[in-house]
């Protein structure tokens, strides 16, 4: 799910998913 994907990215980057996607 999108929430789980966001959590994974959060753990990997330590930042907000929005920052990772550059949205």
From Swiss-Prot:
One of its GO terms (molecular function) is toxin activity. Expressed by the venom gland. One of its GO terms (cellular component) is extracellular region. It comes from the Eukaryota. Keywords: Disulfide bond, Myotoxin, Secreted, Toxin. It is found in: Secreted. Transmembrane segments: none annotated. Contains 7 disulfide bonds. Belongs to the phospholipase A2 family. Group II subfamily. Snake venom phospholipase A2 homolog that lacks catalytic activity. Shows myotoxic activities. Induces local edema a few hours after injection (5-10 ug) in the hind paw. This is Basic phospholipase A2 homolog CTs-K49c. The lineage of its organism: Eukaryota, Metazoa, Chordata, Craniata, Vertebrata.
